[in-house]
């Protein structure tokens, strides 16, 4: 079995609070992997650790077979996209402008793929509409588009359906399945909603 992410007794403590306690898990390549737990169970902490936003207290993980204490982990992280907690969106920009900004940050040489990416997430008809005027579901989909800007093959989504109305949940579910089936992107989803995860993972 080929694994994108493997964790081994991964632990994170903050003074007297243990956010993550000895987590061992394996995310197979090509899967939609659901990571379920109540609020405060350490789901976001795990995502912050694998994204390099924090360091584990003990234990380890590997991404594409590269351990987190290797200097090459940076290269592995370039192959992943993530939406951690709330999407990183500039509210006074359009969807297209947000993506152009992300392309510049990543040093991508051309904007040629932006329209295709907007179409993929269902935001190709938003025109000059600013992100601040988007619905919550549209903002979530824009966040995913931004995470996809570097053409990753591993996507990490932190509570992607949290706060969405029923239609927004359906649209998010369809998008995640589409990314997995058509683009062969491995997806790790954290959620406290078991029913919704069971329809995906």
Predicted segments — roles?
Residues 51:
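Helix-to-loop junction immediately C-terminal to a conserved catalytic motif
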Residues 155-159:
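Catalytic Walker B motif of ABC-type/P-loop ATPase nucleotide-binding domains
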Residues 170-183:
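Helical segment within the ABC ATPase nucleotide-binding domain
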């Amino acid at each position: 079995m080929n694994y994108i992410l493997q964790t081994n007794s991964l632990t994170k403590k903050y003074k007297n609070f243990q956010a993550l306690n000895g987590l061992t898990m394996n995310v197979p390549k090509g899967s939609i992997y659901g990571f379920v737990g109540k609020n405060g169970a350490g789901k976001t902490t795990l995502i912050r650790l694998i994204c390099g936003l924090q360091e584990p207290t003990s234990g380890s993980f590997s991404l594409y077979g590269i351990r987190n204490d290797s200097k090459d982990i940076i290269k592995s992280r370039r192959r992943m996209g993530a939406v951690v907690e709330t999407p990183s969106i500039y509210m006074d920009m359009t969807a297209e402008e947000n993506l152009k900004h992300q392309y510049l940050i990543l040093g991508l040489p051309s904007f040629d793929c932006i329209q295709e990416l907007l179409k993929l997430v269902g935001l190709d008809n938003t025109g000059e509409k600013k992100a601040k005027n988007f619905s919550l579901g549209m903002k979530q989909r824009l966040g995913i588009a931004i995470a996809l800007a570097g053409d990753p093959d591993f996507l990490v989504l932190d509570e992607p359906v949290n706060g969405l109305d029923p239609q927004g949940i359906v649209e998010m579910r369809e998008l995640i399945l589409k990314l997995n089936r058509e683009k062969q992107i491995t997806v790790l989803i954290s959620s406290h909603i078991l029913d919704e995860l069971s329809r995906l993972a």
